């Protein structure tokens, strides 16, 4: 008994109080801790786990709410995500590099088309055996016209073949060869001086119109209705001339028609040039490089043929 009393008496002071406190901690129910004071919250002290209730589950945002500024995010480069993406999936004409690549591609194709056509015209103009053969066999002319019309409708009306390689280049090659044959055969009926003169006039006019279209602030793409009316006027004028031609040839009426045609397609050249540039009311998609080259090529060829009818002199 004495030892027991001594053992109890020999306990360190405060031990019994600690056991009581531990017992109270085990038996007392959990009470949520009080929120920290303003000073503790602002100084970062007193921020213990369990001081606040758990955050609610995330609510999915509407796409229009979750806006990210591309210029302030490291995952964007020049407004586009840095991951794998198509170059032209999200296209902006404000990108000067994309515009230059597109215009360069169109004019490269156009240059090849014009060189092929120039070679055919030179062959039909300077080589007498070839010139005599094509004039003696008009069936090739109508066959080339049918091929030209079919390929033109395919490229102009069907976006699938026009945009998919290699069908777009194959169709454009066939179209260019057929149009070159038609232009060369028409040139074979005029003397060499007239052909060279009209080639020079066409080159100067097309170069001037192209530079003007790039520099002017006037938007030709907003005048498509006016150009369509002029084109219909030209079409019906040509139809009337075709009806009157078997009965009587009127030189001045034919000259007016040729001047009207050259003027209309000069305006169309300005329109098609501005469609390549962007920064206008209407612009071509960067996938339409075949369509852009096709339109400008036709404009230049029609300008040349109308100048040939206006200034050319037939061979004797």
Curated annotation (Swiss-Prot):
Entry keyword annotation includes Transmembrane helix: yes
TM region positions: 106-126, 138-158, 165-185, 194-214, 225-245, 250-270, 290-310
GO molecular function annotations of the record: calcium channel activity
Main location class: membrane
The organism's place on the tree of life at top rank: Eukaryota
Induction comment from the UniProt entry of this chain: Regulated by the AKT1/LEF1 pathway in breast cancer cell lines.
Subcellular location(s) per record: Cell membrane; Membrane raft; Postsynaptic cell membrane
GO biological process, one term: negative regulation of extrinsic apoptotic signaling pathway via death domain receptors
InterPro entries, alphabetized: Bax_inhibitor_1-related (IPR006214)
Glycosites: 191
Tissue: Highly expressed in breast carcinoma tissues. Enhanced expression correlates with the grade of the tumor (grade II/grade III) in primary breast tumors (at protein level). Widely expressed. Expressed at high levels in the brain especially in the hippocampus.
Keywords recorded for this protein, A-Z: Apoptosis, Cell membrane, Glycoprotein, Membrane, Postsynaptic cell membrane, Synapse, Transmembrane, Transmembrane helix
Region of interest (Disordered), ranges: 1-53
Coiled coil segments of this chain: none
Record's bilayer topology term: Multi-pass membrane protein
Keyword Cell membrane assigned: yes
Entry's Gene Ontology cellular component terms: endoplasmic reticulum; Golgi apparatus; Golgi membrane; membrane; membrane raft; postsynaptic membrane
Record family assignment: Belongs to the BI1 family. LFG subfamily.
PANTHER family for the chain: BAX INHIBITOR-RELATED, PROTEIN LIFEGUARD 2
Self-association state and partner proteins as the record states: Interacts with FAS/TNFRSF6 and BAX.
Purpose of the protein: Antiapoptotic protein which protects cells uniquely from Fas-induced apoptosis. Regulates Fas-mediated apoptosis in neurons by interfering with caspase-8 activation. May play a role in cerebellar development by affecting cerebellar size, internal granular layer (IGL) thickness, and Purkinje cell (PC) development.
The protein's name in its UniProt record: Protein lifeguard 2
Gene name per UniProt: FAIM2
